[in-house]
Amino acid sequence: MTHVPQIKIPATYIRGGTSKGVFFRLQDLPETAQVPGPARDALLMRVIGSPDPYGKQIDGMGAATSSTSKTVILSKSTRPDHDVDYLFGQVSIDQPFVDWSGNCGNLSAAVGPFAISAGLVDASRIPHNGVAVVRIWQANIGKTIIGHVPVTNGEVQETGDFELDGVTFPAAEVQLEFMDPAAEEEGAGGAMFPTGNVVDDLEVPAVGTLKATMINAGIPTIFVNAESIGYTGTELQDAINSDTRALAMFEDHPCYGALRMGLIKNVDEAAKRQHTPKVAFVRQAGDYVASSGKKVAAADVDLLVRALSMGKLHHAMMGTAAVAIGTAAAIPGTLVNLAAGGGERNAVRFGHPSGTLRVGAEAQQVDGEWAVKKAIMSRSARVLMEGWVRVPGDAF
């Protein structure tokens, strides 16, 4: 029996925010994977180690969490006034598919640094010392992200003293601006509030009717009050992720929320859409102990938020969900805004399982409709490994 040898593909393994992923230049992928389709999906699944019925991704670069089962493809931008096109693929851990329906806000922090180092940004736009402004086209959702990347001696500066809760070591700060984050390109997926309301009654079988804010900003997100589903808003991962009843309940929320938001036509479609919408529960500020053991005081935050990604409670906060939080907080009457104390505000600091995060948003009413010019937050990014990733030659 002859066995097909492995091939090697240039790749870089990078931490961005509180996530990690495998980054590729589009031109480095095998020819059949340079275009969307089954070959590309099969390749990325094999790289990450999916589908894995054991749920461990031992035979790949993934680490069996939603924060680490991620891939990114970058290329020089084909759009005016942009430097790089950024495509994100969320690889299912135990199912054979890649979800292309949304962005990863955390890995967005690594796009600018990688694009500069990979030669995808025009050299004339990179200062010898200072901050490079990288104009990113987020191809999944058709939106612009501006990355502010520190540069020292003509190279991306990765080390620094910026601390990010959920990441053990300090690094250089990368500020991100998510421009016009509501909805998707040309309005696909609906307006900022797809139902037309800042709060709706959401019917979830086996749970009941819940007050919910369903917003499409950064990423489609469903916010509910913690107390309405029996939680305090101070929970850490084990409280949810080891509770089969809780996991079953949270599996239903995105299905029925996605229907109301117009993201799917029937509940069955939700099985192929694990990445969106996100579900989060909120409450007013309170004291709690983060997963690191650090005490978070109510006085240090405006509200508490816990969010789920791919059916599990996130260890910190998804970057795109943070954009949704900042946007919803800026609009009076949403559940997020009310949990933060109500009124108009252009920034909030919220508590999550690993600590706190500040996010800002510029919101205004135009002809009676709310619009958000941009959402702003800071993350960090660091290359962990670069070289080649290997996969069997017949894997795609």
From Swiss-Prot:
<feature type="binding site">
    <location>
        <position position="19"/>
    </location>
    <ligand>
        <name>substrate</name>
    </ligand>
</feature>
<comment type="similarity">
    <text>Belongs to the PrpF family.</text>
</comment>
<dbReference type="GO" id="GO:0019629">
    <property type="term" value="P:propionate catabolic process, 2-methylcitrate cycle"/>
</dbReference>
<comment type="function">
    <text>Catalyzes the isomerization of 2-methyl-trans-aconitate to yield 2-methyl-cis-aconitate through a base-catalyzed proton abstraction coupled with a rotation about C2-C3 bond of 2-methyl-aconitate.</text>
</comment>
<feature type="binding site">
    <location>
        <begin position="66"/>
        <end position="70"/>
    </location>
    <ligand>
        <name>substrate</name>
    </ligand>
</feature>
<feature type="active site" description="Proton donor/acceptor">
    <location>
        <position position="104"/>
    </location>
</feature>
<dbReference type="Pfam" id="PF04303">
    <property type="entry name" value="PrpF"/>
</dbReference>
<feature type="binding site">
    <location>
        <position position="319"/>
    </location>
    <ligand>
        <name>substrate</name>
    </ligand>
</feature>
<feature type="binding site">
    <location>
        <position position="278"/>
    </location>
    <ligand>
        <name>substrate</name>
    </ligand>
</feature>
<keyword id="KW-0558">Oxidation</keyword>
<feature type="modified residue" description="Cysteine sulfinic acid (-SO2H)">
    <location>
        <position position="104"/>
    </location>
</feature>
<feature type="active site" description="Proton donor/acceptor">
    <location>
        <position position="318"/>
    </location>
</feature>
<comment type="subunit">
    <text>Homodimer.</text>
</comment>
<dbReference type="InterPro" id="IPR007400">
    <property type="entry name" value="PrpF-like"/>
</dbReference>
<feature type="binding site">
    <location>
        <position position="106"/>
    </location>
    <ligand>
        <name>substrate</name>
    </ligand>
</feature>
<keyword id="KW-0413">Isomerase</keyword>
<comment type="pathway">
    <text>Organic acid metabolism; propanoate degradation.</text>
</comment>
<dbReference type="InterPro" id="IPR012709">
    <property type="entry name" value="PrpF"/>
</dbReference>
<protein>
    <recommendedName>
        <fullName>2-methyl-aconitate isomerase</fullName>
        <ecNumber>5.3.3.-</ecNumber>
    </recommendedName>
</protein>
<feature type="binding site">
    <location>
        <position position="314"/>
    </location>
    <ligand>
        <name>substrate</name>
    </ligand>
</feature>
<dbReference type="GO" id="GO:0016863">
    <property type="term" value="F:intramolecular oxidoreductase activity, transposing C=C bonds"/>
</dbReference>
<feature type="binding site">
    <location>
        <position position="309"/>
    </location>
    <ligand>
        <name>substrate</name>
    </ligand>
</feature>
